[in-house]
Amino acid sequence: MDDIYRKAMKAQVGELAEEMDELYQLVSTGQPVSRVIYRAVERNLQLLTEACIGIAKHSLKGMAKEVPSDARQAFAKLRQLGLDHSGADWNRIIGMRNALVHAYLNLDAERVLDVVRQRRYQVLLDFAAQRLNDAA
């Protein structure tokens, strides 16, 4: 993985981690969540997923492996190579990302908020940290 990309993504993922922790605090109070906070949750989940997709593809590229255009295939290839130990359900994660981008009017807001309330986004942060700190 290119050092410039790695450095930029570490900074980006670090910012997203801080923002997700702030959002966790805001949505876990038991109080109603404002539309602005909810939109921030949606956007940050989208950005974090996009970051992981980019990291997966750049990891493969850095190893001179063929990079699938489909994100699910990129994660599957990393798993086949023994380079994704996150346990993440990438099909569900990418499905949610697609819904956030393309079907946002039909989303169940409580399901989206539960991802944050239950800190299920942590698997994305863990994957990113593992891949960005790896030598490849």
Regions found by a protein language model. Give the residues of each.
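Solvent-exposed interaction patches of small proteins and small membrane subunits
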Residues: 1-136
